[in-house]
Every structure is written in C-alpha cells, then in structure tokens.
Amino acid sequence: MTSPALNFITFNQDHSCLAVGTSKGFRIYHTDPFSRIFSSDDGNIAIIEMLFSTSLVALILSPRHLIIQNTKRASTICELTFPSAVLAVRLNRKRLAVVLEEEIYLYDISNMSLLHTIATSPNPSAICALSPSSENCFIAYPLPKPREDPDANRPAHAPPQSTFVAPTSGEVLIFDTLSLKAVNVIEAHRSPLCCICLNNEGTLLATASETGTIIRVFSVPKGKKLYQFRRGTYPSTIYSMSFNLSSTLLCVSSTSDTIHIFRLGAPPGNTTPAGAPIESPASQRQDRWSRARSYDDSESPGASAADSPKNEPAELNGPGAGNNQGGHTRGSGSFSSMLRRSSQIMGRGVAGVMGSYLPQSVTEMWEPLRDFAYIKIPKSAAASGASRTLRDAPGGPLRSVVAMSSSSPQVMVVTSDGGFYVYNIDMEHGGEGYLVKQFSVNHSVLEGDDKSDASGYGS
C-alpha cells in the first residue's frame, strides 16, 4: 500500500506535538514518547496548525478555505473563505493569523471575530511569525514596500507601463496584535528576508535573509541586535528556525544536511560592542569541530560590500575537503591541523580584544560567532516525490523542520521523506550531536538505536 504524500509538517507551540498533513487526511503525534495520538483520513490537507496541545486544529483543504476543527468532538467550529489562497496560518491562545500573499487577517480566537486586516507587500513564501505568548502577543512580517518607487531597480525586460514590485525587504515590522498597532521596524538584513521566528515569550526575534550565511537575533519590541551568528561559508536557503523554550539555544535547518545549534546568553558585561558573547576557553575548544565561516557582511544594514572579503577559502577540514564528506571531524592529529586550530584560537582572541576599540560595522567582521553544536541529518535514499510535494505546498519550501525538546537537551528533526530523528546535544562541550531515536510519520518504524517508543507508534 502506497503511503499518502506528505504536504505539511509542523510542531505545535511548545514542541510537545507534531502535526502532519497528507494527501489523505492528517495525523498528530506526541514527540516524547513518540506516538500517534490522532489521525483522520479525510481530505487533502495542505496546511495544518495546532493550538498547543488542545484538540483545536486549523486546516486548509482547498486553497481559499480555512476550517477550525475540534478533533476530540469531531466537530467543525467555524469555516472561513478568503479572497485568495491561504499561504500560512498562525495560532496562539489570543489570536489567529491567516496569511495571504498580500494580506494578513487577524482574528480573536475566543469568538473568531475579525479584528484587523494588515496589507503587506507580496509575500509568496508567507514569511510571518506569531508569538506563542498571550502577553507579548506580537506578529512579525516583512516591512511592506511602496508599490511604485521611481528609484526601484526595474528589470530591463519589464514593460514600460508595468508596476514594478520590489522583492521582500530585509526589514521586519513588529505588530502588536492586542493593541492592533505597529510598534517597531527592525532593520535585520540588506538582502530580502527568507525566514523569521519568535521565541516562546515573544521577546526575541531570529532572522535570516535569502543569503542564509548570517543569522541575527533581536530583542522584541525594542529591536536591539543581541546576537549575530554565522551559519556557514556558502549561501543556503534557511528552511526552519526554532528557539528552545528557555530561549538559550536556537536551531537552524537549511538546504545543507547540517542542523546548526547556536547558543544564546552570556554573563553581564561579557559581550562585544555588537552584542555577541565573547567566547570562553571551553567554547574555544570547539574549534576542532568548527568549519570555515563566511566573512561576507554585505547583507548587514550597517556594512557595505567593500567592508570585508567575499572569497574566504574554506578550511582544509571543511565540507568537501579530501574524503571527509561529513565536514565535521574531531581533529586529524596532523601538525598542520593543530597549527591551524591554534591560529584560529589566537586570531579569535585578538578579534575579541580589537573589537572593543573598533566601530560596530568593523567589529562585526571580526566576531568569531559560530554554532555551539551541530547535527548531520541522514540523506534520504527514498524517491524525491514526497520532497517535491512538500516544496510545492502552499506553506512554502520545506525540506526539514527542527525543534528543541521541552523536557531534555535534545533536538528533533523531521525531514520531507517522513523521517523523525532525535539527537542528544552535549550542553557543556557542544560539538556533534548523536542520534538516539528515529521513527517515521509514514506508518513504519525506521531502524534506530532506541525502539522503546516504537510500541506507541500508530496506536
């Protein structure tokens, strides 16, 4: 029997559940222990969103039609029809946000009354984040751009009388869904936005541009830049970002097969002028697992393309070097690799000292910010049909979704072929996480190191 195509995969707000929309209904799973708790075989589900661990789910079966359903009572609470296709749905205990390509509809979730309609620039990727918090109830989305701008870089092939619409901006608008007022605009990137997310308390915003080499974290609603991380050397499309519930870690997945985990937080006063924590000797020891980082800050709002070199070569132990396909090694033991790591530690130490004397736009070039830990996800050996379905889904491109467990230092990864993977992270030393459990959301249990949760699967 052929498994239904996967259309949509998402974690709920506290990462305790996983919802999967398929061509033949939808399923909901507990993440720890991993077990199926609800399933429905009705409809071709393009989008599904949960409200924490309640029985309320939002479903998109046809492009313009939203259904709010109570799974416990098997009843429909309400149905809404929109003027164009629904690209995303966001929920918290106060608000429901429905994202269309050029509008966002805000509803009071207690009575489903329409509160406000936000006009946006064309946003086909549905870049939008709603805080899970009922107090800091902010929604973030790309700052709308004027539809007609005489200074816009109109393509040469555009018809003379046409209206050129600029691509999504690199600025984020923060909107308070309780007061229904815009509260701030954050200049996050010079390149168009690709992915944004808010933490559980609605106090932190993570952003990534289409370039995908730099991840930034800002305070909300003030918009102060707190952290700047480097994901890698080469451009990559960011698919998913997620804070853990305590907002001390940020997970990022992309087109590469590496999940990056960045550490947030530093002792008071132990920061660089740009707000990035200075590394301790313990974190410097992680160099043996680090890869080269791009020093291209051209997407930074405060930097120009001439500020830094763009062709920084990768380290010899980086991806694609020799026979090391994983890209992360625990040191080759050679004299040259030892010398290189020593030079990196010394160079980064000098960068931290020099940063205190240089302007912010210059110190950002020196910041030795990198992932605290990382994960190598398995490459799918299955046919790419499921992947194509997920990429073509109204929710936008989706190859992998990540979240941190709420009860342990573990990272959960769901891939577009239906694999569900759980990795342990060493919270003291970081480095490479190791696989401890693996299951499938396609009705079969994958081989793995831990079969303890398999009995609950499919029940």
From Swiss-Prot:
Residues 264-339 are annotated as: Disordered. Disruption phenotype: Does not significantly decrease the growth rate under nutrient-rich conditions. GO terms for cellular component: endosome membrane; phagophore assembly site membrane; vacuolar membrane. It is a peripheral membrane protein. It is found in: Preautophagosomal structure membrane; Vacuole membrane; Endosome membrane. InterPro entries: PROPPIN, WD40/YVTN_repeat-like_dom_sf, WD40_repeat_dom_sf, WD40_rpt. Residues 229-232 are annotated as: Necessary for proper localization to vacuole membrane. Its main location: membrane. It comes from the Eukaryota. Keywords: Autophagy, Endosome, Membrane, Protein transport, Repeat, Transport, Vacuole, WD repeat. WD repeats lie at residues 1-39, 188-228, 233-272, 393-433. A motif (L/FRRG motif) lies at residues 229-233. Residues 285-296 have a biased composition (Basic and acidic residues). The keyword Mitochondrion does not apply. It holds the Pfam family PROPPIN. Residues 319-330 have a biased composition (Gly residues). Residues 265-277 have a biased composition (Low complexity). Component of the PI(3,5)P2 regulatory complex. Interacts with ATG2 and ATG9. The ATG2-ATG18 complex is essential for autophagosome formation. PANTHER family: WD-REPEAT PROTEIN INTERACTING WITH PHOSPHOINOSIDES WIPI -RELATED. The 377 first amino acids might form a beta-propeller domain involved in specific binding to phosphatidylinositol 3,5-bisphosphate (PIP2), leading to the association of the protein to the membrane. Association to the membrane can also occur through binding to phosphatidylinositol 3-monophosphate (PI3P). The L/FRRG motif is essential for the cytoplasm to vacuole transport (Cvt) pathway, for the recruitment of ATG8 and ATG16 to the PAS in nutrient-rich medium, and for its recruitment to and dissociation from the PAS under starvation conditions. Component of the PI(3,5)P2 regulatory complex that regulates both the synthesis and turnover of phosphatidylinositol 3,5-bisphosphate (PtdIns(3,5)P2). Plays an important role in osmotically-induced vacuole fragmentation. Required for cytoplasm to vacuole transport (Cvt) vesicle formation, pexophagy and starvation-induced autophagy. Involved in correct ATG9 trafficking to the pre-autophagosomal structure. With ATG2, protects ATG8 from ATG4-mediated cleavage. Autophagy is required for proper vegetative growth, asexual/sexual reproduction, and full virulence. Belongs to the WD repeat PROPPIN family. This is Autophagy-related protein 18. It comes from Gibberella zeae (strain ATCC MYA-4620 / CBS 123657 / FGSC 9075 / NRRL 31084 / PH-1).
